[in-house]
Amino acid sequence: MLQTISLLPAYNKPPVATLLHPHRSSSSSPLPCGHVSPVTHGGLIMNPQKRLRSFSANMKCSSTNSIIDDTIIRNGQRIMMSEYFDVQLKVRDYELDQYGVVNNAAYASYCQHGCIELMESIGVSGDRISRTGDALAISELSIKFLSPLRGGDKFVMKVRYCRISAVRTYFEHKIFKLPNREPILEAKATTIWLNKKYRPTRMPLEITSLLDKFFTR
């Protein structure tokens, strides 16, 4: 089942139309492995510090397009892919399990939060999506756990677009613990555009134009 993404800030009530109502995960009732739970936009950190920076990535997104180093060939044009969007977060106590480490389900929320911040940075906000009457959903999420996070840990979520198509957008995620940048996680996510009937549909032209500008700048 597809998991819709809430792009609304926590202090706004989500509309009744297309976006799923967000809920905050609780350490008292941890979710099963692999479950992607909807989260509030601000539920992970009150003041995320975000910026764009260059980062040499080893993980490549599987694609039918040609990939050379950190570039991708799309429509005959070479597009740089080394630019990650950074969001700095801090582990909250309610995200821990009985062993004192971050519950595995919380990492899916971190990845979702990174996607939200990246999309809003290029102008794809919840308001813009809701005006179309459509919704954005996660159809696939693959996570590779490298090391655990614990209560009070500060970390940086690095997210970038890997590839886009008419219906789907592909993301790559990396998490590093601060300040020593210890690798914590690598993940790949696929989002899909849905119409009013929750059927896959083509992205509106205004949205694809914004994504293309991000790729080709």
Swiss-Prot record:
The keyword Iron-sulfur does not apply. Residues 1-56 form a transit peptide. Mostly expressed at low levels in glandular trichomes (lupulin glands), and, to a lower extent, in stems, leaves, flowers and cones. One of its GO terms (molecular function) is fatty acyl-[ACP] hydrolase activity. Belongs to the 4-hydroxybenzoyl-CoA thioesterase family. Its EC number is 3.1.2.-. GO terms for biological process: lipid metabolic process. It comes from Humulus lupulus. GO terms for cellular component: chloroplast. This is Acyl-acyl carrier protein thioesterase TE1, chloroplastic. It is found in: Plastid, Chloroplast. The keyword Plastid applies. Keywords: Chloroplast, Hydrolase, Lipid metabolism, Plastid, Transit peptide. It holds the Pfam family 4HBT_2. Acyl-ACP thioesterase involved in the production of fatty acids and beta-keto fatty acids. May play a role in cuticular wax synthesis. It comes from the Eukaryota.
